[in-house]
Amino acid sequence: ALTWLQRLRLPAVAVDPSTLGEEVAEYHRVGTSTELETHLFDATTDYGVPTLYAVQTSQVDPELAQVVAATCDIDPQRALAKIYRELASLRIALRSHARGPRAQEIKGQDLTVVGGALADAELSMRHVFDFLLEGERPVHALDEIGTLPASRPAAGGSADSAAGPDPLEQVVANLERAGAEAIVVDITTDEARQVGMHVIKALIPEAMPLS
């Protein structure tokens, strides 16, 4: 929402496939193997958590010529894999709405997430994304976005959990430095706890809502 409302000219993100882990490389290969073009941007805020913003464009899809997604992760490479999953699921959901009996009604409700997405998905609306798709801008390498130490296994090895600072502690410190508060609630069910799982819900009141 922050990027869209402020029309932020975000830096572009460059991906070097040779630096990607095996699993992430496969997501990137599949995600770039069609006529769809995914434009990646660095939307990281002062919280320091690597955040990707993507505009996926098509020249042959009249229903979904533009689709937008955003995601974040402590590890920029995991964020990249997530953005491709998010875009794929969004295309399925939006196409279902676009071909539904209430498509025109939903599209007219541009104050809703789905309505706005469908209205701006038509090729004739490509111009509303010019602040992202046009003009020169800085380019950041994927692994350089954010200010957190990415913890991922080295090629052929395993991650050393003791190496480097705890990224979660750094996130909390970044929030405090930005004057933000993290409210965390344990919502683990008895069934989840019995199998060793823990579930929390976190709210940061000072952060911009998703939509």
Where are the regions that the model predicts?
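Helix-biased "structured C-terminal domain" signature
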Residues: A1-S211
